[in-house]
Amino acid sequence: MNPLEKDIAESKPQLAPHEHARAPVTALAVDYRDGEHVPRHRHRRAQLLYAIEGVMTVQAEAGIWVAPPTRGIWLPAGMAHSIRMHGQPRVRTVFVAPRAAGHLPDRCCVLAVGPLLRELIVAATRVPPDWRPGGRDARLMALLLDEIRLEPALPLHLPQPDEPRVARVCRGILREP
């Protein structure tokens, strides 16, 4: 891991139960302030970031993704990224273990979040990260995965240039718009 990238579970203790859970899918609710920045980090699990209010901008090596409240940002496991908050985002995050992420996107993308998926995400944040197979929680999480699989990827992505000089200029603009 690049020393500039943090193990997010170490720097944000509320994430540790989700990063290390036995359950294949967990969810977490976190509210942020306008302008708050989550520094570059990565997760062991894939992640669907969804703001029920506010807007998020995710920056990764391959580009920048923007998600208003009717959109979510899918990040594959291990993808280094940072997040900038706009407004006062009420973020709901779904974490998916690699073993459960089959048939889910293998690249970062913005997904549509319809009414059913939205309510499933919100309900999933009320399920403890140590839920057991076979009950209501398992059925809810299975349906949540099914709905994520069905949502289309949307073109809300700004690719980063490959040419080093242009990339350096773009990074400067992003740091100080």
For the regions a protein language model found, what residue spans apply to each?
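Aromatic/histidine-rich interaction motifs
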Residues: P105-R118, A123
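Short histidine-centered beta-strand/loop micro-motifs
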Residues: E36-H43, I83-H86, H103-D106, P133
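All-alpha amphipathic helical-bundle segments outside canonical DNA-binding/catalytic cores
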Residues: P133-L140, Q160
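Generic protein-terminus/edge-of-domain signal
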Residues: M1-V55
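Basic, amphipathic alpha-helical hairpins
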Residues: A124-R132, D146-P155, P161, V169-P177
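Ligand-binding loop in jelly-roll beta-barrel domains
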Residues: I64, G78-C108
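A short beta-strand-loop-beta hairpin characteristic of the jelly-roll/cupin
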Residues: L49-P68
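Short acidic-glycine-tyrosine-enriched beta hairpin
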Residues: Y32, A62-A77
